[in-house]
Regions:
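A short mixed-secondary-structure module that forms the rim of ligand-binding clefts
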Residues: 44-79
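N-terminal leader/targeting segments and the immediate start of mature chains
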Residues: 1-25
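A short, Trp-centered hydrophobic/proline-enriched beta-strand micro-motif
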Residues: 18-32, 71-73
Length: 142
């Protein structure tokens, strides 16, 4: 039973990963006090069975996530859109940062897994909804 549940979870998570990877750009929404903040992101990586995003610790988004780790991601691709509501959990391990930077080598000009700025987060308690104008929404939890 556990193997089946774990396999289904990975398959569902992969669908979210594939959507965000294909879209290339997604929008990450946070909150700063009572003001919503949204900005484009482009990193998505699977590491140790979790979906990760990356930013820099010096950016306002890092402070916003620290104050309130509940975020929402939105992207549009091929006539469908996805919304992912989740909590972001920082993973400060060099291995997690290296995996992200290996997946996005163009970021190595600005980031390094051993610097004090590179920051990666994995998604926890995530609910993704894939919608379109022609089909019923698909809800994915991971």
């Amino acid at each position: 039973m556990w193997t089946k549940i774990n396999s289904e979870r990975k398959s569902s998570m992969k669908r979210v990963y594939d959507f965000l990877k294909k879209a290339e750009t997604y929008y990450l929404a946070t909150v700063e006090g009572d003001q919503p903040r949204v900005r484009p992101f482009g990193t998505i990586n699977e590491f140790e069975g979790k979906l990760y995003i990356q930013t820099g610790k010096v950016k306002p988004v890092s402070y916003q996530i620290a104050a309130n780790p509940k975020v929402e991601i939105c992207a549009f691709c091929d006539g469908e859109w996805i919304r992912v509501a989740c909590e972001l959990v920082e993973d400060d391990r060099v291995e997690a940062k290296k995996s992200m930077l290996d997946a996005y080598p163009n970021l190595r000009g600005m980031y390094d897994e051993n610097d004090d700025n590179t920051q990666v987060f994995y998604m926890k308690n995530a609910t993704a909804t894939i919608s379109s104008f022609t089909a019923a929404p698909v809800v994915i939890q991971f």
